[in-house]
């Protein structure tokens, strides 16, 4: 279960970083904005790994011997992307007009990694529904907190959250490889 908690923490970093940005750049009430961010990001971060898990489970029969390598490879790719994004100079997005459509798009964008990571749940000895719920709850908590942190600290912490999440995913990928060998 510790693997799922670490996975949840790592996957929540995208939503956490975006929530920090939302808090820093948006004039809305932090409580209302925090609740919206928690709801959107938490729900999508819970659903996407479940979809990835179900897709991976369907392929597991003919991929059984390669499953740990595929899962580790996907996690390593996600980790590399997150680490790269933590150093990349991003384009400032105008999120001052935060509509439901914008929140929906942000929730989808931040949960694509969770879709791929859901495949890793097929090779971990965990209950998928509990794992996905835990990922969603942890993401919701981090998203809510991120809005308040963004109000206080501004955008400085955004890239640090991405880097930490990427490093944790890389460690999980290495553990999966070590167990498979």
Curated annotation (Swiss-Prot):
Broad class of where this protein is predominantly found: membrane
Pfam families tied to this protein: Mntp
InterPro entries: Mntp/YtaF, Put_MntP
Cellular-component GO terms for this entry: plasma membrane
Membrane topology, record value: Multi-pass membrane protein
GO molecular function per UniProt: manganese ion transmembrane transporter activity
Record keywords: Cell inner membrane, Cell membrane, Ion transport, Manganese, Membrane, Transmembrane, Transmembrane helix, Transport
Keyword Magnesium: no
Subcellular location: Cell inner membrane
Ranges that cross the membrane: 4-24, 31-51, 59-79, 102-122, 129-149, 161-181
Family of the protein in this entry: Belongs to the MntP (TC 9.B.29) family.
Function: Probably functions as a manganese efflux pump.
PANTHER family: MANGANESE EFFLUX PUMP MNTP-RELATED
Protein name per the record: Putative manganese efflux pump MntP
Gene name for this UniProt entry: mntP
